[in-house]
Amino acid sequence: YHIEKYEEGRVKVFKIHKNIAVGRGINSDHPDEKYLEAFVGIIDEINPDIAHIQHLLYSSHRILDVMKERKIPIIYTLHDSWLECPKITKLMPDNSMCSGWSEEKCRDCISSSKIYISNDKMASLLSKIYGKFSMHRIFVNMVSIIKKILTWFGTGKKSAESDIKARYENMKKIIDSVNLFISPSQYLRSAFASW
């Protein structure tokens, strides 16, 4: 990881640059010891009074645990429906808007999606491929091919159901860790509050 440090006026800015080749399924947590270590180093250096999270997509959710352990209040800005919807968009397979979360509805929506691959299958296949192909372009192309193959064979509703349950518990943990949510729109605020 590359950590960039600079000041904007009197505000210290730290950026952790992390390259992402592919997501890890719908659960969206990316446990990564090096990322967490870099984050803890920054927290140790600045000892903040408050933390503002813009998004946790492709980040280790353990950073919230670190802040909670240190009693650092967390503010989270909502930008989309990521906490509620694994597809982020809340669009059903027929392109209608989802009317609200339910385990069964999410399972059916995700398992009917052409891009859904269970976390276990994706992790297993990517670990085999990543060892063979180090060039990013080849790696990404192989991921695309594997997604198509798995879609043809189907991953099944049972796999989607366990992924939905795990994701829901993970998102609930995130929500419980946050002290204050900020929403840029009344629509997003209402949708989040009703979830």
What are these regions (language model features)?
Residues 69, 96-180:
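Membrane-proximal helix-turn-helix segments that form the acceptor-binding/catalytic region
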Residues 26-31, 51-53, 157-162:
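Short, flexible loop segments at the rims of nucleotide/cofactor-binding pockets, characterized by
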Residues 1-47, 110-144:
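A conserved catalytic-core segment of Leloir-type glycosyltransferases
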Residues 1-2, 86-91, 96-97, 195:
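Short aromatic-enriched loop/helix-cap "lid" or pocket-rim segments at secondary-structure transitions
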Residues 41-59, 73-76:
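Short N-terminal targeting/anchoring amphipathic segment
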Residues 82, 187-189:
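Alpha-helix capping/helix-boundary segments
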Residues 59-62, 189:
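Short, well-ordered alpha-helical microsegments
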